[in-house]
Amino acid sequence: MSKNFIVLDVEGYSTCKPYNIGYIVGNKSGEILSGKSFALMPAVWDNIQYKIKTMNVDGLASAHEMAHNNIKEILCTDNEKYTKVFDNHKFFGEFLTDITKYDIKRVWAYNCTFDKGALTRLFTEEQNTIVNNLVTFCDIIPAILYTKLLNKEYIEWCKKNGYLTAKGNVQTKAEVVYRYLTGNLEFVEEHTGLADCKIEYEILLNAMKETKSPRRTPCQAWKIIQKFCECEGIDIPALDNK
């Protein structure tokens, strides 16, 4: 199997086509062979419309703020941070070219169900078939969960630093995991495709250093951690509130 793989991150509402897609081509040694960030202009308006329609929906405030900042940056700057494409077929062409050029067999993403779903909405049926015949989508969450997070140290660290959900579950989002792995409690995820890819790549490399075959099937990390706590007698609020 090819030693190269893609780490991909998309930005956009879960019911819309993504307005920003970033990905890097790398390998287990930490070498980044390519990095790209695309602003998909046809999808920008779709996401703006969705934001307007759901302004008063509970639970979407942070998503709205993130979309507002990202789209504002895309529309108001001419810097080289994004490659603006006005035809989704152009992105598909570049993505397919890199898959072929670097002999990619696996595409990794943090919570890959979301990212793969976004690509499915973006691509035509034929394009989806082509991509799915060439690569397997893999989830970074189980890879890092079973190598670095499913232990008392991580759970106690989350409790100490307040990284629990409103229901008391241990958080496993990329920003929190990256803070844990690096010791940098001030780190803030940028929430743009290429920037997030870079930290997710580092997270994946941490998992790959621990095992030759990291787990890659999507899972409910919070539930697995909760079950681990029950078995190990670790006290967390989620267990107290049953």
Feature map (PLM): residue ranges:
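Short, glycine/acidic-enriched loop or turn micro-motifs at the edges of active sites
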Residues: G12-S14, P142, I199
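Acidic, Mg2+-coordinating catalytic module of metal-dependent nucleases/exonucleases
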Residues: Y102-C112, G117-A118, K159-A238
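Short, polar/flexible loop-turn hinges at active-site or ligand-entry regions and domain interfaces
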Residues: D78-Y82, E126-V131, N184-E190
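Acidic catalytic cores of enzymes that act on phosphate-bearing nucleotides/polynucleotides
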Residues: D240-K242
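Substrate-recognition/cap helix-loop segment adjacent to the acidic, metal-dependent catalytic center
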Residues: T113-F137
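Conserved non-catalytic scaffold segment of RNase H-like nuclease domains
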Residues: S2-T120
